[in-house]
């Protein structure tokens, strides 16, 4: 093959492989591994309001932050390829990123299928988000590495057009690690709904005298019901006693159980419990909006952000020397414009930056590569 290419002068095109043979992370078992269905499904889990709130906070927040291309050595912002602005033809970038975070949260991994590639180097130019329920994997004999993937039962290539780009979470999916917690939250919620739909009798009238005929009993109960609708006090004869047997939701401890499980769900999703309005976590010190956002970014959002940034910056997608980053500072952590201008002015006075660079920092520059789109 090498002799033939030297004689004909043909050069072999470099084949950029898409993370060939991804490793199976976490403990392997046929029931609790990232490539198998969990005991609690995603749709069922989202029936827990606290979990839906955590999911929306994580996926919704990250999905709204734009992606930018930077030069790794200098941090210079480069022109973004089209797929950074819209990875999939089928939905906006924010939706694709939000459901990528959704997959990482619930399953511990996410999938994009390569639907277009650049002719020059074979790197992907368009993707399609693939639901985890559609993907199955064939492992090697040691159950350590993936040999092949299949979408809807059809095996796909491991590189190039039609292959899967795999995003691996820094944590296991909550459908595997939090099965018992999610199931408990669902059970308590179901029990409270059943109790509300089929209320128990709150008490009964006990006759200590002679037995009454059924017609008089019904008349007595009707009179009691009518009186209770008009006033809260009642009068009973010496032969009648009222016995209370009902339990309020507080006595049944539904409220306490729901609040406690809301806290556990928040811990499971690595979200501060006060974001889901858990009563036992309402006491907190004062923090301004910026500091609260920084804490939420560092503790909750960053693991998902890093997983996506690092995967999109790998050599099979982005040219070596460049990195893909979320534009966090100018969006999620954007400061007061007056404060930003004051800082820029100080940097100009100290001759740390030029006026042109300052204009670029505030998106006022008409020149440069910022904003250019490359096919």
Predicted regions located by residue number:
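Small-residue-rich helix-loop
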Residues: 290-292
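Hydrophobic alpha-helix feature that most strongly marks membrane-spanning transmembrane helices
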Residues: 270, 306-309, 313, 317, ...
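Charge-rich, acidic-biased intrinsically disordered regions
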Residues: 74-80, 122, 315-338, 364-365
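Short acidic alpha-helical/loop segments enriched in Asp/Glu that coordinate divalent cations
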Residues: 264, 272-285, 310-319
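Aromatic side chains
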Residues: 147-149, 286, 296
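Divalent metal-cofactor coordination and adjacent catalytic microenvironments
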Residues: 101-104, 109, 295-325, 329-332, ...
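Structured, contiguous alpha/beta core segments that scaffold functional sites
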Residues: 1-254, 258-260, 264-267, 275, ...
């Amino acid at each position: 093959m090498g002799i033939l290419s030297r004689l004909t002068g043909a050069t072999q095109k470099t084949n950029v492989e898409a993370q060939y043979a991804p490793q199976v992370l976490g403990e392997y078992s046929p029931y609790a591994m990232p490539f198998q269905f969990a005991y609690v499904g995603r749709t069922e889990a989202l029936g827990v309001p606290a979990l839906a709130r955590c999911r929306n906070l994580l996926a919704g927040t990250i999905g709204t932050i734009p992606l930018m291309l930077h030069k790794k050595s200098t941090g210079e912002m480069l022109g973004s390829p089209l797929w950074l602005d819209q990875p999939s033809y089928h939905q906006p970038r924010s939706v694709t990123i939000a459901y990528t975070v959704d997959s990482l949260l619930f399953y511990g991994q996410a999938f994009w299928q390569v639907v277009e590639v650049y002719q020059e180097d074979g790197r992907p130019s368009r993707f399609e988000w693939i639901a985890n329920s559609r993907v199955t994997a064939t492992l090697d004999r040691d159950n350590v590495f993936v040999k092949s993937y299949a979408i809807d039962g059809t095996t796909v290539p491991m590189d190039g057009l039609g292959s899967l780009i795999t995003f691996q979470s820094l944590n296991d999916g909550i459908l595997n690690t939090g099965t018992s917690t999610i199931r408990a939250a669902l059970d308590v919620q179901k029990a409270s709904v059943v109790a509300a739909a089929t209320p128990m009798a709150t008490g009964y009238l006990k006759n200590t005298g002679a037995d009454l005929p059924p017609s008089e009993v019904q008349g007595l109960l009707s009179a009691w019901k009518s009186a209770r609708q008009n006033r809260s006090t009642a009068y009973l004869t010496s032969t009648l006693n009222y016995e209370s047997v009902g339990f309020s939701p507080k006595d049944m401890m539904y409220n306490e159980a729901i609040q406690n499980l809301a806290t556990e769900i928040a811990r499971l999703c690595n979200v501060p419990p006060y974001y889901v309005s858990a009563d036992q976590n309402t006491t907190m010190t004062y923090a301004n909006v910026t500091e609260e956002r920084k804490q939420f970014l560092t503790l909750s959002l960053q693991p998902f952000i890093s997983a996506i940034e690092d995967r999109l910056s790998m050599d099979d997608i982005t040219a070596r020397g460049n990195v893909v980053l979320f534009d966090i500072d100018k969006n999620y952590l954007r400061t007061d414009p007056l404060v930003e201008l004051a800082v820029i002015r100080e940097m100009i006075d100290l001759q740390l930056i030029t006026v042109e660079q300052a204009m670029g920092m505030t998106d006022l520059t008409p020149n440069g590569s910022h904003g250019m789109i490359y096919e």
